[in-house]
A protein has these predicted regions:
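Surface-exposed binding patches on compact interaction domains or structured appendages
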Residues: 465-469, 700-735
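Acidic, Ser/Thr/Pro-rich low-complexity intrinsically disordered segments
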Residues: 431-520, 529
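C-terminal tail/sorting-segment detector
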Residues: 853-879
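Surface-exposed, proline-anchored Ser/Thr-rich loop/turn motifs
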Residues: 784-813, 821-826, 857, 874-879
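C-terminal PAP-associated
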Residues: 33-407, 528-686, 698
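Short glycine/proline/serine/threonine-rich loop/turn segments at secondary-structure transition edges
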Residues: 518, 597, 745-754, 851-858
Length: 879
C-alpha cells in the first residue's frame, strides 16, 4: 500500500495537515468505508476549477487583480501555469514537431470541417506567447442549421471574450466564424465553458457560458443568448444573465432545453465564497426572461467534491441532472430526477463507483490534474428504448493499491542539467532523491519498461512551500523541447502520476520547480509497478465506459467502449442518441502512436440495442493531433467536447492541434441504410423464379453489414452471391442479392411462400434493416410423385414450446433416416428410419429424447438422410 499524492491544501485544512500529515478528502462516510483498512487516505482535497475558469483567474492575476492568498493556494494559482518557457536548444519553442511519416492524414468517417477562421487573429509573438488555442467544444443542430461553440483563448491576448462560436446553414458542409458572442451588458464578456442547445419545436438556439460582469470582475456569473437563423445568419433575439456570481465562483455550467414545455434548465458548480463546490440548479419557464432561485442538488456530505453537472430532458419532460463526485479511492457519478419539470427532485442515486486517474490528463495535457466529468444523453426517439438515459466516463485500474517496496534502493539524481543523454538511470521499485537549485534546474531520470506495465510514481516528501512539475516523457524524440511527447503531467507540492506503457523501451521522468523557491528544493519519489486485481473493469490507466438506465435509479452494468489494446490512453467520452434510437459515443484516442501513445485521433463507437452492445471503434478525425506541441503557450484539451444528433445524422465536434495551436472541428456523419425487396411474384410449380433484394448505404460514411435470405416453405434454392454473407459498402453504394426460388410441382407445403431479407449493421450492433416479399405458386397439371424433389421443409412452428411438425419430400423411393440432434452433435431423438415411397411425408417431435425425457430448451437440428444426401434445419425449443 502507498500514499496517494497530497494536494495543494486550503487554509481550512492546515490544522488537519498538522495533526495528521495527511490531506483528507471531503468524502462521504460511505466512501471512507470503501477504502480498505490498509489503504492510506491521502488524496487531493476536493475537485478543481474547470480549465476555462482557471485560465480566466490566471489572466486576472496577470492584469493585477488581487485575490486572497488562501484562494490562490487553494487553486494552485500561486505558481505559474506550465508553459515550458525554456528549452535545451535556443529558438526551438515554436518549431513544428518532427513527426515525419508518423503524422499522416488519413480518412476518418465524413470529412472534417474547421469551424474557426484564423484570419486576423493575434500571432504568438504579438500576444507575448500567451495561449491562442481553442477547446471545450459544443454543438446543437436543427435541420440544416448547426451552431457550434468553443473556448477561444485568443481573448487572453485581445482582452475580449474567451469564448467563440460559429454556424453552418448547409448541414455542416461549410462554416462561418461568428467571432465573439455579444455581451448582455457593455463591458462584460463571455469567459468560456460554452454549451449550446436548441428547442426542436421552435428552432430557437441557445448559447450559454461563464460570464464576467463588470460589476464583480473575475467572480464569474452566467450569460445566455437566444437566437434563430434568418437569411443564412444567426440572429440574436435575447441576451440575459441567468445567475450572478457575486462573492461565489460559478463554474462548469450546463444547459438543457425542454422542447415539450419550452422550459430552460441550467446547472453549475458553485464554489461558495470561492472555496468548496456544490451543484446548483435553476430553471426558466418564460424562455429565459426570469429564473428560479437555485436548488442545491448535491448532498452536504459531498461539499467540495462535486463538479461537471449536466441537466438532461427526457421525452415526457422528465429532468435528470448528473454530476461527478470525487472520492478516495473510489469516485462516483451521481444523478437526480425530477418529474415535475424541475420544480423538485427525487433522491440522489449512484450511477457507478470507479477508480479514476485524477493525477494527469491525456498525453500533452498541460494541467496538473485530470477531470473525470460525465458525458450524458437521453433517448427521445420513437425507438424501443425511448426515455433511456446514458452516462459515459473515464475509469482507471486500481493503481492505488500498488505496493511500494518496504526498503527500496535509493537512487540520487546526478545528470547534467536537463540533458536526456545523461539522465540518471534507475529501476522501477527504487526510491529517487534529488533537489532543484533554481527554477531553471531540470532533473531527468530514465528507466526501462515493457508494454502493458502500469507504473505509479509519487513524490511523498518535499518542501510544503514548493510546487513541482513532474512528467513522463517518451524517448521517441528528445532532441528539442517542442518535439517532446509528454505523456503525463502532474503539478503539485506532492506530484504523482500513473501510466500504462504502450511499448517496450526507455522512458524518462522529468522534474522541475514551478514555484519560486525556496532553494534548494529537495524531493523524494517512490516508484512501483501495479499488478492488476481480478475483477477490475478498467484494463489500464484510463478506459472509457458507459451505463444506462430507464428511470435514473436502476443502472446497467458498465460496458467498455474502447476496443484498443489495453495500454493506450483516451479521454473525454461524450454520447448522443440519434433519431432512430441508436447511441453514439466518441473521445480523444491515442492508439495510433504505437511507440509512445502520444498522438491522437477522435474515435467513435455505436450501439443499436439500447447500449448493451457497442460496435467496433471507428476513426472520426482525418488528421493526427500532437497535443504536446508548445505553440503559443501550452496546449489545453479542456474538460469536455461536444456531440449531438438528429435523424440519422451525428455531429461530433472537437478540438485538435493538427495545425499547431488547437482549433475546433466538426463533421456530419450520416448513418442511413436500408433494405429493398422486390414486389410479390407468381411462378408455376416446378419452375424457378428470381427475386432481387438490395442493401443500400444512403449515408455519407462506409458501413459493414451481414445479410441473410430465408423463406417459410423451403423453396429457396440459393442466392447470388449467397443466401448469407457480409459486405462493406462505401457511401451511396448498393449490394444486390439475387435469390432463386423453386417450388415443387404441387406447390407443397403451401401456395404462398414468404421470403425475408435481413441485414445487420456490424458497426451499430442491434440495428437491422429488413423487408419481405411473397412468391405465389400455381400447381402444374399431371404432377406425379416422381416430379417431387428431395426437400426438408422449415419446422413448424419454430421456435416451439411443444410439438414440432417436420415435413419432407422424396423424389424417389428409398431408405430414409430423420433424427433430432443437439448443438454439440449428439443424437437426441430418432423420428423415422426405413423405406419410404416418393412424395410428401411428415413426422412430429414432442420435445423428448429417445428415452421419453423432456429435453432442455435450446437449439437443436433436424437432420434428413435420403437419396445419398443430408439436409438439416435448426429447431428452437423454448420452455
Amino acid at each position: 500500500m502507498h500514499p496517494a499524492p497530497r494536494p495543494k491544501p486550503s487554509l481550512a485544512l492546515v490544522p488537519v495537515l498538522l495533526a495528521l500529515a495527511l490531506a483528507l478528502p471531503l468524502a462521504r462516510p460511505a466512501d471512507a468505508a470503501e477504502a480498505s483498512a490498509g489503504r492510506p487516505v491521502w488524496a487531493k482535497s476536493g475537485v478543481h476549477l474547470s480549465a476555462a475558469y482557471e485560465r480566466m483567474l490566471r489572466e486576472e492575476i496577470a492584469l493585477g487583480r488581487v485575490l486572497p492568498p488562501g484562494l490562490l493556494e487553494r487553486w494552485g494559482l500561486d505558481v505559474p501555469a506550465e508553459d515550458e518557457s525554456f528549452a535545451e536548444a535556443p529558438g526551438d519553442l515554436l518549431r513544428a514537431p518532427r513527426l515525419g511519416a508518423e503524422r499522416v492524414a488519413t480518412v476518418g468517417l465524413a470529412t472534417d470541417a474547421q469551424l474557426n477562421d484564423k484570419t486576423g487573429d493575434a500571432t504568438c509573438g504579438s500576444c507575448g506567447s500567451r495561449p491562442l488555442g481553442q477547446a471545450e467544444t459544443t454543438i446543437a443542430a436543427y435541420g440544416s442549421f448547426l451552431l457550434a461553440g468553443w473556448n477561444d483563448t485568443k481573448g487572453f491576448c485581445t482582452g475580449g471574450p474567451v469564448q467563440g462560436y460559429g454556424w453552418s446553414t448547409d448541414g455542416g458542409a461549410t462554416w462561418v466564424d461568428g467571432g465573439d458572442p455579444p455581451s448582455p451588458i457593455p463591458g462584460g464578456r463571455f469567459r468560456g465553458d460554452p454549451v449550446h442547445a436548441v428547442n426542436r419545436k421552435t428552432g430557437s438556439f441557445y448559447v450559454c457560458g461563464l460570464y464576467e460582469d463588470p460589476s464583480n470582475g473575475a467572480n464569474s456569473g452566467l450569460a445566455l443568448i437566444r437566437g434563430h437563423f434568418a437569411g443564412g445568419t444567426f440572429v440574436v433575439d435575447a441576451n440575459t444573465r441567468p445567475r450572478a456570481g457575486g462573492s461565489d465562483f460559478l463554474d462548469k455550467e450546463w444547459l438543457a432545453v425542454d422542447s415539450l414545455s419550452g422550459n430552460l434548465y441550467v446547472t453549475y458548480s458553485n464554489f461558495v465564497g470561492g472555496w468548496y463546490s456544490q451543484i446548483e440548479f435553476i430553471r426558466s419557464t418564460d424562455n429565459g426572461a426570469s429564473w428560479s432561485a437555485p436548488q442545491v442538488l448535491s448532498a452536504p456530505a459531498s461539499y467540495g467534491n462535486v463538479q461537471g453537472s449536466r441537466p438532461l430532458v427526457g421525452p415526457n419532460g422528465e429532468v435528470y441532472v448528473v454530476w461527478y463526485d470525487y472520492g478516495y479511492p473510489l469516485s462516483h457519478e451521481r444523478v437526480r430526477r425530477s418529474d415535475d419539470f424541475g420544480a423538485s427532485f427525487g433522491s440522489e442515486q449512484t450511477i457507478c463507483a470507479f477508480y479514476e486517474n485524477s493525477y494527469s490528463g491525456a498525453p500533452g495535457y498541460r494541467r496538473g490534474w485530470a477531470p473525470t466529468l460525465p458525458g450524458a444523453a437521453v433517448d427521445v426517439s420513437t425507438g424501443p428504448h425511448r426515455g433511456r438515459l446514458y452516462v459515459t466516463w473515464d475509469e482507471a485500474v486500481d493503481f492505488y493499491d500498488a505496493p511500494f517496496p518496504g526498503s527500496p534502493t535509493t537512487v540520487t539524481e546526478n545528470e547534467s542539467n536537463g540533458f536526456f543523454a545523461s539522465a540518471t538511470p534507475f529501476t522501477v521499485g527504487n526510491r529517487l532523491r534529488g533537489g532543484c537549485a533554481s527554477s531553471s534546474d531540470v532533473d531527468l531520470y530514465r528507466f526501462s519498461g515493457l508494454r502493458g506495465q502500469t507504473l505509479f510514481f509519487a513524490a511523498d516528501s518535499a518542501r510544503d512551500s514548493t510546487t513541482f512539475n513532474m512528467r513522463l516523457v517518451c524517448a521517441a524524440d528528445t532532441s528539442t523541447l517542442n518535439n517532446y511527447r509528454l505523456l503525463t503531467f502532474s503539478q503539485s507540492r506532492y506530484p504523482a502520476f500513473a501510466f500504462t506503457l504502450p511499448a517496450d523501451g526507455t522512458w524518462y521522468v522529468r522534474l522541475n520547480i514551478a514555484s519560486s523557491g525556496p532553494y534548494p528544493a529537495t524531493y523524494r519519489i517512490l516508484t512501483t509497478w501495479d499488478t492488476p486485481t481480478p475483477g477490475e473493469r478498467a484494463r489500464d490507466h484510463r478506459d472509457r465506459f458507459v451505463a444506462h438506465s430507464d428511470d435514473g435509479t436502476t443502472w446497467s452494468t458498465p460496458v467498455l467502449l474502447n476496443d484498443d489494446d489495453p495500454w493506450f490512453d483516451g479521454i473525454f467520452p461524450e454520447v448522443t442518441v440519434d433519431g432512430t434510437g441508436a447511441a453514439h459515443a466518441f473521445w480523444h484516442d491515442f492508439r495510433d502512436d504505437p511507440g509512445c501513445g502520444a498522438l491522437s485521433y477522435e474515435y467513435m463507437t455505436s450501439s443499436g440495442d439500447g447500449g448493451d452492445t457497442w460496435g467496433a471503434n471507428r476513426r472520426v478525425s482525418d488528421a493526427q493531433s500532437f497535443w504536446s506541441i508548445n505553440a503559443c503557450g501550452s496546449a489545453n484539451q479542456g474538460d469536455y467536447q461536444g456531440i449531438t444528433s438528429q435523424g440519422n445524422d451525428v455531429y461530433p465536434c472537437w478540438a485538435d492541434s493538427r495545425l499547431g495551436d488547437p482549433d475546433p472541428y466538426a463533421e456530419a456523419d450520416r448513418f442511413a441504410h436500408g433494405a429493398g425487396c422486390p414486389p410479390p411474384v407468381g411462378v408455376g410449380g416446378g419452375s424457378n423464379v428470381f427475386a432481387v433484394f438490395s442493401l443500400t448505404n444512403t449515408g455519407n460514411v462506409p458501413g459493414t453489414f451481414a445479410w441473410t435470405v430465408t423463406d417459410d416453405n423451403g423453396w429457396l434454392d440459393g442466392a447470388t452471391p449467397s443466401t448469407s454473407g457480409s459486405v462493406t459498402l462505401a457511401a451511396s453504394a448498393v449490394q444486390n442479392v439475387t435469390a432463386t426460388l423453386r417450388p415443387s410441382g404441387d406447390c407443397w407445403p403451401a401456395a404462398v411462400d414468404t421470403v425475408r431479407f435481413t441485414a445487420s449493421d456490424i458497426f451499430i450492433p442491434g440495428r437491422t434493416y429488413s423487408c419481405q416479399t411473397t412468391v405465389t405458386c400455381a400447381p402444374t397439371t399431371a404432377v406425379t410423385p416422381a416430379a417431387a424433389r428431395l426437400a426438408l421443409a422449415p419446422p413448424q412452428p419454430n421456435p416451439s414450446s411443444g410439438r414440432v411438425r417436420l415435413a419432407f419430400t422424396l423424389s424417389r423411393p428409398g431408405p430414409v433416416r430423420l433424427a433430432l440432434y443437439s448443438a454439440s452433435g449428439a443424437r437426441v431423438r430418432l423420428l423415422a428410419a426405413g423405406q419410404l415411397g416418393a412424395g410428401v411425408h411428415e413426422a412430429g417431435w414432442d420435445g423428448r429424447d429417445d428415452d421419453g425425457r423432456r429435453v432442455a430448451a435450446g437449439l437443436y437440428y433436424a437432420r434428413l438422410e435420403a437419396e445419398g444426401r443430408t439436409l438439416s434445419r435448426p429447431v428452437g425449443l423454448v420452455r
